[in-house]
């Protein structure tokens, strides 16, 4: 038993793994007894392996790049794998967001799926929106695959899945080898995300829908409060009321409303042969209509309303008949979703019908053909300011779009702000010149027009200007 620091005289009993021949007294040498948090078992505890080992590298001769001109733009971010290859097996998943080390110097990132029609001698196809002539393994300013980071603990610059991100297989010689697949997320991970309605989406919908969902949220909170008040143990009641109050404070900041029936997050996968008006979504009824919403959400013009077609043969072949949390759409639909790509982007899927009316509008003319990576990418480092605070900048432009929408800005103005938001969201990841976008899209003038104000002392301010965008801002409360 290990003595409890905060409870003198009490102890916690633990199991200690030790080599054969260890004396009983040595298991009480607590300074040398460590937890197994950095290890993982693949066989129910019979053996343990490090939770992370440096990734195995794939020979680039095994892969092919499908460039934009060859159709790569329609599947940008997708990694197609030959089925049945042991070191490229996705385990129990039909799809996963992965990283694969190549030649020890570069890596590919994106959504991995199986393809049963790969050319002979090719085990992997990487789809890109970059043009022919871009080297597969070039320098950091001119390459399809990304250079690895100089960090033995995190060569991909983003952490892989904590448990199960790496796996092992038995090769033809009977030896255990590390798989080439490093998962960030896999089938089943996206559907478990929170399904509340964000104020970013709800504030741009008709008032009856807003009232309905907020009233449901209020009713849920009232029921929770009544349940706590019915408790008879004063100590438990006090703790529960404090937790309830904290939750209410947080809810007032984040402004999330009750979910609509059957709405769920799903990861998007490309099906180029899918019609512009259809979606492959086996978690929904064939023939019903659904709305797709991607965050950050600019407005109704980013909401495609699609008919579920679960009989589409290509989709069944790629995604399977029973995916846990994926839908299939074509590239045109993805472009309407504020320029989504297929490297792990997600959408909120909302079934529509007589009881759920989602307001949607045609895509903005000012967004047609706009590709932020082509317009603002590819510049040599050192010639522009590199984005380092995506969350902050994204918050600013999201608030601007919300305020402009609520205050009645015209479509041309909103298109400028949305174009800039599309640049900002990918600026850090794809090294885009977001400052030039800020100039080209007149962001300073838009902020002045739609967010500029004077306080009671005559001082000029810019920033969040409506209740929705100001909800997360701090304010000073006068003493009473």
Enumerate the language-model features and the residues they cover.
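Core mixed alpha/beta domains of very large multi-subunit molecular machines
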Residues: 2-350, 354-367, 461-480
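C-terminal catalytic or substrate-handling cores of phosphate/nucleotide-
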Residues: 344, 354-480
């Amino acid at each position: 038993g290990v003595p409890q620091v905060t409870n003198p005289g009490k102890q916690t009993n633990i199991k200690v793994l030790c080599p054969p021949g260890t004396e009983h007294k040595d298991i009480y040498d607590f300074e040398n007894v460590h937890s197994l948090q950095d290890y993982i078992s693949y066989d129910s505890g019979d053996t343990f392996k490090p939770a992370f080992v440096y990734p195995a590298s794939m020979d680039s001769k095994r892969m092919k790049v499908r460039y934009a001109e060859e159709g790569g733009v329609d599947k940008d971010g997708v990694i197609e794998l030959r089925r049945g290859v042991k070191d490229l097996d996705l385990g129990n998943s039909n799809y996963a967001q992965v990283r694969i080390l190549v030649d020890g110097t570069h890596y590919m990132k994106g959504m991995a799926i199986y393809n049963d029609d790969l050319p002979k001698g090719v085990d992997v196809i990487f789809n890109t929106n970059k043009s022919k002539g871009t080297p597969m393994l070039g320098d950091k300013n001119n390459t399809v695959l990304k250079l690895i980071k100089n960090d033995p603990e995190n060569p991909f610059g983003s952490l892989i899945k904590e448990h199960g991100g790496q796996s092992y297989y038995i090769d033809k010689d009977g030896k255990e080898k590390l798989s080439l697949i490093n998962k960030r997320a896999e089938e089943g991970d996206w559907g478990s995300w929170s399904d509340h309605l964000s104020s970013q989406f709800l504030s741009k919908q008709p008032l009856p829908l807003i009232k309905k969902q907020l009233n449901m949220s209020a009713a849920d909170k009232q029921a929770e409060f009544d349940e706590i008040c019915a408790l008879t143990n004063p100590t438990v009641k006090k703790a529960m009321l404090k937790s309830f109050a904290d939750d209410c404070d947080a809810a007032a900041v984040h402004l999330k409303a009750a979910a609509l029936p059957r709405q769920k997050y799903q990861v998007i996968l490309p099906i180029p042969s899918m019609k512009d008006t259809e979606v492959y979504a086996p978690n929904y009824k064939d023939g019903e209509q659904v709305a797709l919403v991607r965050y950050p959400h600019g407005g109704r013009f980013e909401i495609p309303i699609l008919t579920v077609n679960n009989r589409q043969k290509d989709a069944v072949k790629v995604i399977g008949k029973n995916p846990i949390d994926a839908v299939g759409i074509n590239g045109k639909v993805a472009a309407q979703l504020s320029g989504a790509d297929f490297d792990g982007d997600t959408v909120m899927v909302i079934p529509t019908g007589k009881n759920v009316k989602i307001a949607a509008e045609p895509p903005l003319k000012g967004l047609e053909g706009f590709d932020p990576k082509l317009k603002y990418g590819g510049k040599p480092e050192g010639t522009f300011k590199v984005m380092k605070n995506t969350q902050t900048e994204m918050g600013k432009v999201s608030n601007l779009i919300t305020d402009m929408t609520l205050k009645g800005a015209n479509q041309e103005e909103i298109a400028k702000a949305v174009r800039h938001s599309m640049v900002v969201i990918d600026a850090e990841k794809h090294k885009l010149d977001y400052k030039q976008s800020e100039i080209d899209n007149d962001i300073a003038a838009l902020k002045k027009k739609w967010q500029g104000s004077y306080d009671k002392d005559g001082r000029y301010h810019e920033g969040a200007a409506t209740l929705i965008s100001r909800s997360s801002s701090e304010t000073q409360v006068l003493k009473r």
